[in-house]
């Protein structure tokens, strides 16, 4: 379920959780710096913390809880968001049987943004039991459905279960096997393709605001620096900077499943990956399996030190969750999905890279 911003935004001194001893309202009153009317387009500044009541509230049955994540567009714009509930002890979680209001914490990290009431930055999934699929279950699913394709459209020869952190850079070349290790391994693509040699985008600093209500309006060159495939197939990430990269794999999520991207292991590097972790049923699949996978776009930031990434380096894992029922409408153009069959795609506010290039006057 997409969650919509309400009519008021509060700028606060710091991020917080209310805990059991306080309400969100009392915490906001204690920490509030300013208040903004979202009935009109409103600028949110970078690295400031905002808390916004959402239009949705919940009255859940005792056996149903929830988990939230940023939407894809939110992650690609480096907007840090987290769901908060009254009495909540952790972000992004809704306890079973929760009845009450919902709030979202917003921190634009790279670009100032313009939002208004009704803007959708995050989404909520409801959970009843239904633990993530074990590797054994995932292997059985991979025998029935192709879950991973590669650039040539071919699926892997087989799904293989591996354990541990060996082969951090795939020795098989990344085009023979789908490696299952607490989910499907996800690796970086620093090679590019026949249609594009761009393997990453690095966000510029001190850019104009991005109005989230706009679609295909902004010139990518004003906000992003393209990184082309180096001969070494290696890229050094500058600490603190924000990058968009693509997975080597093209993933397919069958209609009866959803998926979630998680970091592979925090011990393999000081970086964060993929704010927007949900993959809807039908992602890279289509109505009847006719789509041969879709790349995952990875939002990556190195933290304290420069970080060297190599082609085919393991960077995350895709966890599959079985749905209670297959949805009536799958991910795709029929429901306005922006990123089906994507390559390395910027958020929908930006013009397609080739279109932006063709609009530049010739000298």
Model regions and ranges:
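DUTPase catalytic domain/fold
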Residues: 1-363
């Amino acid at each position: 379920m997409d969650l919509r911003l309400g009519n008021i935004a509060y700028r606060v001194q710091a991020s917080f959780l209310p805990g059991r001893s306080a309400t969100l309202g009392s915490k906001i009153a204690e920490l509030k710096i300013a208040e903004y009317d979202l009935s009109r387009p409103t600028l949110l500044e970078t690295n400031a913390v905002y808390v916004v009541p959402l239009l949705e509230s919940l009255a859940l049955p005792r056996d149903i809880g929830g988990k939230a994540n940023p939407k894809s567009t939110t992650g690609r714009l480096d907007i840090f968001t987290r769901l908060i509930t009254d009495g909540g002890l952790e972000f992004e979680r809704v306890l079973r049987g929760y009845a009450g209001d919902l709030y979202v914490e917003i921190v634009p990290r790279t670009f100032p943004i313009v939002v208004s009431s009704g803007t959708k930055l995050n989404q909520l999934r409801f959970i009843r039991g239904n633990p993530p699929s074990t590797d054994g279950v995932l292997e059985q699913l991979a025998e029935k459905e192709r879950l991973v394709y590669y650039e040539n459209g071919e699926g892997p020869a087989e799904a293989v279960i591996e354990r541990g952190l060996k082969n951090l850079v795939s020795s098989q070349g990344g085009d023979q096997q789908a490696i299952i290790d607490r989910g499907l391994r996800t690796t970086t693509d620093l090679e590019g393709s026949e249609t594009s040699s761009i393997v990453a985008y690095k966000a510029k600093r001190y850019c104009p605001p991005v109005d989230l209500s706009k679609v295909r309006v902004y010139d990518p060159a004003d906000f992003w620096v393209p990184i082309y495939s180096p001969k070494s197939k290696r890229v050094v990430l500058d600490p603190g900077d924000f990058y968009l990269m693509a997975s080597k794999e093209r993933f397919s999520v069958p209609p009866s499943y959803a998926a979630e991207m998680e970091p592979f292991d925090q011990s393999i590097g000081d970086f964060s990956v993929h704010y927007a972790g949900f993959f809807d049923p039908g992602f890279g699949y289509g109505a009847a399996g006719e789509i041969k996978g879709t790349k995952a776009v990875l939002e990556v930031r190195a933290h304290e030190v420069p970080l060297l990434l190599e082609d085919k380096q393991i960077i995350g894992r895709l966890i599959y969750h079985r749905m209670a029922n297959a949805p009536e409408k799958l991910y795709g153009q029929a429901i306005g999905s922006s990123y089906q069959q994507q390559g390395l795609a910027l958020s929908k506010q930006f013009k397609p890279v080739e279109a932006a290039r063709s609009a530049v006057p010739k000298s």
